[in-house]
Each structure stands twice: as C-alpha cells, then as structure tokens.
Amino acid sequence: MAFTRSIALFAGLALAASSAQEATILGGYTQKNATSDDIELLTQATSSANMYNKNVDTRICLIAIENLETQTVAGTNYKFQVAGCPVETDDELGACDDRNCDYSSYNIVIFSQPWSDTIEVTSITPAEYQG
C-alpha cells in the first residue's frame, strides 16, 4: 500500500513538474511590462556608444518601446522591441530628435549585471514582423 502511494505521489509530482516547465521555459525569455527602471536602462545603454559591444554596428535613435522580454542568465538579458530610426553618428543615439523620421521596429538586447556594474548593448537587429 505504501508503495502504491509512493508511485502515485511520484506520478503527481512528475505531472506538476511537466506542467510548470510548459509555463516557463528555463533559460528562455519571459514577457515583461516595462518599468521606469527598464526604460532608464534602455535610455542609458543606447545613448552612449561606449556601452555598445564592438560587434554591434547598427545605430538607431529611439521613438517608442513596443515590447520587452527578459532572460535570466549570469545577469539579465533585456530584449526590447522598439520603434526607431537609423542614425549616421553616435551624437544622434538615444531618443530621436526628429520624431517624424522613417522608423522601423528593432530588437535591442542589453546585458545587465548590476553586481559588476556591467551594462552592454549586445545586439541591434531588425524585428521580425509578428502579424
């Protein structure tokens, strides 16, 4: 009888664990509502060319945040989907001065590790259309 209860308990735990895995993919991105701290991080990171990884050669100014997802790693990856416009110089980074520019959607990934004082723009790519 105790053996049967143990099997039933184990099966129940396995079922609960598989349901929880479906809800949250470990290591995957999770949808998040942008807070004022998230917006400040985005603005700080994208306004200074010194915070861009050397492999990031796309430069844009920002018009609006369209979406945010986060991923916990050895810190946090923030994947912002933004409306923005391509710019020619680092002086134009940050918020767009010309709000009537020909904007597109971009994904900006920013890595943040507060305990080591690390903030880095790791990629800027055109966003895929989600229609």
Curated annotation (Swiss-Prot):
Q: Which residues are glycosylated?
A: N33
Q: Which domain of life is it from?
A: Eukaryota
| Motif, Secondary area of contact: chain positions | 71-75
Q: Which InterPro entries match?
A: Cystatin_dom, Cystatin_sf
Q: Where is the signal peptide?
A: 1-20
Q: What switches on its expression?
A: Expressed during infection of host plant and in germinating cysts.
**Gene3D superfamilies, A to Z:** 3.10.450.10
GO CC annotation:
extracellular region
What is the protein's major site of localization?
Answer: secreted
Site feature location: Reactive site:
G27
CDD domains named among the record's database cross-references = CY
Q: Where in the cell is it found?
A: Secreted
Q: Which UniProt keywords apply?
A: Glycoprotein, Protease inhibitor, Secreted, Signal, Thiol protease inhibitor, Virulence
One GO molecular function term of this record is: cysteine-type endopeptidase inhibitor activity
State the function annotated in the UniProt record.
Secreted effector that interacts with and inhibits host apoplastic pathogenesis-related papain-like cysteine proteases. Inhibition of host proteases by a pathogen extracellular protease inhibitor forms a specific type of defense-counterdefense mechanism between plants and microbial pathogens.
The family classification in the record reads:
Belongs to the cystatin family.
| Identification of the protein by name | Cystatin-like cysteine protease inhibitor EPIC3
Name the gene for this chain.
EPIC3
